[in-house]
């Protein structure tokens, strides 16, 4: 088999070693006699997977113990609703619209309250990150939303706005 390179915005090419290990463990995960897909989410084996994943994330991202790590189903689109549902206490949030993902998040947030577009690069098809040095942040905004890395348009915040 000839391996291909994948330059799409979504999943990337994985090393063959990783794929081979995953294939082997598909039938027998670390000597348990079953695949992870067959395990009870209450089993000790599965709990160990989650505990190790949380520990690795905390180490990699320097997440302090006073923060919770949540493993949630759904992708980015699900988060567009979860963010305002959980953070929009005053029913006001500010959005910096820099691409399709931020645009979708802004639209979803408007269902739950007032979602202000305080900066945007829609005028030039999201080909740049707008100047965020003097943002008109709403006094009553519960949060300011950005999509840091716009995979569709190839733009990225290199420094986060001071909000």
Locations of regions flagged by a protein language model:
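Active-site phosphate-binding strand-loop segment of PLP-dependent enzymes
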Residues: 10, 109, 121-163
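Active-site-proximal loop->helix
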Residues: 86, 104-113
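A glycine-rich helix N-cap at a beta->alpha junction
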Residues: 113-121
């Amino acid at each position: 088999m000839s391996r291909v390179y994948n330059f799409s915005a979504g999943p990337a090419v994985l090393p063959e070693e990783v794929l081979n290990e995953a294939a082997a463990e598909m039938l027998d995960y670390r000597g348990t006699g079953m695949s992870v897909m067959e395990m009870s989410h209450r089993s000790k084996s599965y709990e160990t997977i989650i505990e190790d994943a949380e520990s690795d994330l905390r180490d990699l991202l320097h997440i302090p113990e006073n923060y919770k790590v949540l493993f949630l189903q759904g992708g980015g689109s699900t988060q567009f609703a979860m963010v305002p549902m959980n953070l929009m206490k005053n029913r006001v949030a500010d959005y910096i619209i820099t691409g399709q993902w931020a645009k979708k998040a802004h639209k979803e947030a408007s269902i739950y309250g007032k979602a202000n577009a305080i900066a945007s690069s829609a005028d030039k098809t999201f080909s740049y990150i707008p100047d965020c040095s003097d943002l008109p942040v709403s006094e009553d905004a519960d949060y300011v939303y950005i999509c840091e890395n716009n995979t569709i348009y190839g733009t990225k915040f290199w420094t986060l706005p001071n909000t």
